[in-house]
Amino acid sequence: MIIYPAIDIQGGQCVRLTQGKKEERKMYFDSPQAVAQRWQAEGAEFIHVVDLDGAFGKGEENMEAIEAIVKAVEIPIQVGGGIRSIEKIQQLLDLGVTRVILGTKALTDEAFLREAIEKYGDRIIVSIDAKEGYVATEGWVKTSSRRALDFAKSIEEIGVKRIVYTDIAKDGMLQGPNFDEIQRMKDSVGMEVIASGGISCETDLQGLKEMDVKGVIVGKALYEGKVQLGKLRGMDI
């Protein structure tokens, strides 16, 4: 199981939001690339980057920070947040990003998703952010009428191989993931599921590994010292 340390960027800084709420923001580090180097030094195999300004529709202001992260580490990077064009996908891949995560646009524009999959294959991930079972969009500000499980099945038919599944109610709460919903998603599709939201301790990670989850994104628990990457090396996680 791959542990993906999360680096959320807003205004060029490494921050965390609680349940995706802009007003519940905590800044941890000025330098996202220094954080990436720290996680790499502690044994991370892959880094998960979210452009929060992009997710909230603010454009290109964090591309410089993303490029700095790519240059600062040797491990692969996946990036999401406000990616709504083939040109933006190409721009990120040209910077050296390994995988690109699509969210809102994958839900609202099937033709775009098909084109992205046809062009880039498994370098495309779709993020399914669920709020009470329904897909949330626009940086989690809006909730669609599409059930998360139905959406997952539909994108699998298109050719998506990997999803990030987030339970928004759990995100940043340090109260444990929604094991039942993660299991339901795993049982419903054949895609690789990367779980996100709510990790609070090593026991949560062990539980997800026992469910055969292939990857877990860990954010606040790392920044608050609840989970230590170096310690995980000897824990068979």
Curated annotation (Swiss-Prot):
Catalytic reaction equation(s): 1-(5-phospho-beta-D-ribosyl)-5-[(5-phospho-beta-D-ribosylamino)methylideneamino]imidazole-4-carboxamide = 5-[(5-phospho-1-deoxy-D-ribulos-1-ylimino)methylamino]-1-(5-phospho-beta-D-ribosyl)imidazole-4-carboxamide
Any one biological process term the GO annotation gives: L-histidine biosynthetic process
Intracellular or extracellular location(s): Cytoplasm
One example GO MF annotation: 1-(5-phosphoribosyl)-5-[(5-phosphoribosylamino)methylideneamino]imidazole-4-carboxamide isomerase activity
GO annotation, cellular component aspect: cytoplasm
Disulfide bonds: none
EC number(s) stated in the UniProt entry for this protein: 5.3.1.16
Location (main, coarse): cytoplasm
Top-level enzyme category: isomerase
Residues at the catalytic site: D8, D129
Biochemical pathway: Amino-acid biosynthesis; L-histidine biosynthesis; L-histidine from 5-phospho-alpha-D-ribose 1-diphosphate: step 4/9
Assigned keywords, A-Z: Amino-acid biosynthesis, Cytoplasm, Histidine biosynthesis, Isomerase
Pfam families hit by this protein: His_biosynth
InterPro entries recorded: Aldolase_TIM, His_biosynth, HisA_bact_arch, Isoase_HisA-like, Isoase_HisA-like_bact, RibuloseP-bd_barrel
PANTHER family: 1-(5-PHOSPHORIBOSYL)-5-[(5-PHOSPHORIBOSYLAMINO)METHYLIDENEAMINO] IMIDAZOLE-4-CARBOXAMIDE ISOMERASE (PTHR43090:SF2)
Family label: Belongs to the HisA/HisF family.
Protein name per UniProt: 1-(5-phosphoribosyl)-5-[(5-phosphoribosylamino)methylideneamino] imidazole-4-carboxamide isomerase
Organism (species): Alkaliphilus metalliredigens (strain QYMF)
